[in-house]
């Protein structure tokens, strides 16, 4: 028997991949449904990998994960927006920065990366001509894609269930069983589950689960972010993911995170954000006016204003410190 802890995108994805093999797999979730944590509250970016430092594990996994989602899309009929990403500069003085970004994309093996002329850019995204955005050049990253995170978790869990995986909801892990330094199972509020392998996919609580097994090699610090969901009636001017690399763009960026942008969804809502704030309380998913104001600094669509806000949600993600 193999046991997987929690049903976010990591837990559901791992369970579904393992269900290809003749294994007895149990997934334990303290909530009453899949994607109850950070996996339900994020902007659904399948990153191209250009933003990552070359040579790092993160850079490699960004690109490999992007390719993996293409397989999942075909196998699970996922709702995916193949939008690609355009990073636009408006002045010749910004060209060295754009070339540097292009070189990083090449080093990270990002497929299809290309520097475009103004004419090529407007042909690829006609909305830029309509809004009158000045363009000197642009970096085109065609592998950027957007998913609906909650729907993706549901699809993974449903397929895993068809393949024989058991999901136990409303089961909170209170301790991890060990014997001679090896994990042998977990103790939940509904009883003991024996398993020679336990996969820790507990998200922001993964360090707490690891500690139960005697592993205190790392700690996880919560980082929350606010995302503004715009009304579907306000159709985005740009169906593609567009970033204008202006001085205002760099000034508005949150110094604690590379994140924060303007993202269309497969259902064509526009998402603004997220912000990024480290918090000591892992249960803190509150939103403040400061967070809301920050999301508007991510807006580069002249046809969208704060009057189009439909909903706000907070996502508590995490950073690992070793």
What kind of region is each of these model predictions?
Residues 2-27:
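N-terminal Rossmann-like FAD-binding beta1-loop-alpha1 element of flavoenzymes
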Residues 10, 33, 205:
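Conserved Rossmann-like nucleotide-cofactor binding loop
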Residues 16-20, 46, 76-80, 175, ...:
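Active-site substrate-recognition segment that forms the wall
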Residues 23-25, 112-113, 198:
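Hydrophobic anchor at the start of a short beta-strand
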Residues 53, 60-63, 88-97, 139-158, ...:
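Short beta-strand to alpha-helix junction loop
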């Amino acid at each position: 028997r193999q046991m997987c802890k929690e049903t976010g995108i990591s837990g559901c994805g791992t369970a579904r991949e393992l269900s290809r093999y003749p294994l007895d797999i149990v997934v334990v979730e303290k909530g009453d449904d899949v994607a109850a944590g950070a996996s339900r509250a994020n902007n659904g970016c399948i990153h191209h990998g250009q933003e990552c430092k070359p040579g790092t594990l993160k850079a490699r996994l960004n690109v490999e994960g992007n390719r993996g989602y293409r397989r999942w899309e075909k196998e699970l009929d996922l709702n995916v927006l193949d939008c690609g990403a355009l990073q636009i500069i408006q002045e010749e003085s910004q060209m060295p920065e754009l070339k540097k970004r292009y070189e990083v994309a090449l080093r990270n093996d990002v497929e299809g990366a290309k520097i475009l002329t103004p004419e090529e850019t407007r042909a690829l995204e006609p909305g830029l001509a309509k809004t009158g955005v000045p363009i000197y050049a642009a970096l085109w990253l065609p592998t950027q894609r957007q998913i609906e995170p909650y729907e993706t978790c549901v699809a993974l869990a449903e397929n895993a269930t068809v393949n024989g995986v058991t999901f136990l909801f409303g089961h909170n892990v209170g301790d991890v069983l060990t014997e001679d330094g090896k994990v042998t199972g977990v103790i939940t509020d509904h009883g003991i589950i024996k398993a020679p392998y336990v996969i820790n996919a507990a998200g922001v609580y993964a360090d707490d689960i690891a500690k139960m097994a005697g592993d205190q090699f790392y700690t996880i610090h919560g980082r929350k972010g606010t995302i503004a969901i715009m009304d579907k009636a306000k159709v985005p001017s740009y169906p593609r993911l567009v970033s204008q690399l202006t001085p205002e763009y760099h000034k508005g960026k949150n110094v604690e995170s590379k994140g924060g942008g303007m993202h269309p969804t497969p259902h064509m809502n526009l998402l603004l954000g997220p912000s990024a704030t480290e918090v000591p309380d892992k249960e803190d998913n509150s939103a403040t006016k400061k967070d809301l104001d920050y999301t508007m600094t991510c807006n580069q669509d002249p046809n969208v204003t704060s009057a189009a806000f439909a909903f706000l949600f907070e996502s508590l993600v995490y950073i690992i410190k070793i």
